[in-house]
Amino acid sequence: AWYLDKQLDDYASDARPDDLMTPVAQSLSEDDRAAVSAYYASLAAPLRVARGQVSVQDIQKGAAIARAGSPEKGLPACTNCHGPDGTGNPPSVPYLAGQYANYMVLQLDRWKRGQWDNDFGGMMSAIARKMTPEDMRAISEYYKRVANPLTTKDPQ
């Protein structure tokens, strides 16, 4: 819930401008935004089936960057901030494990192009500028396949 709550707050304050979400978030009180976040966090995550072709080499490349970074490109390991299991560090560092790959690529691309600036100290913007589209896809496809205990509900 904390990540969605932060995003709604960022939409409401215009730190994350969006033609659709900004007016919606601005129409909600802080308590309403927290309630919406809690509601969505309580929903069981759907079964996720991987679509499309992704090579084992791409997933291995993503895992390597996630765990060790890419010193030659000046990329730190994702695990340095997002944790060894990719579950993040609330409230400022979101989880990556189990996240939709296309969503992650989109966010990284927006940081790279300077469209997002709501990350702490501009850290993700600086990192994304050093990434190739292939790096973004590899990391995103890797984390898509990492189980996240925070979002995986017990079916019982």
Where are these regions (language model features)?
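Gly/Gly-Pro-rich "capping" loops immediately C-terminal to redox-active cysteine motifs
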Residues: A1-D18, T22-L28, T79, G83-R113, ...
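Short sequence/structural segments immediately N-terminal
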Residues: A1-Y3, Y11-M21, L28-A35, A44-G52, ...
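C-terminal capping alpha-helices of c-type cytochrome domains
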Residues: Q26-V49, N102, A126-P155
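C-type cytochrome heme-c attachment and multiheme electron-transfer modules
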Residues: E30-D32, V56, A66-P71, T79, ...
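The canonical Cys-X-X-Cys-His
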Residues: V36, L75-D85, I139
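Electrostatic cytochrome c docking/interface patches
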Residues: S42-P71, N89, N148, T152-Q156
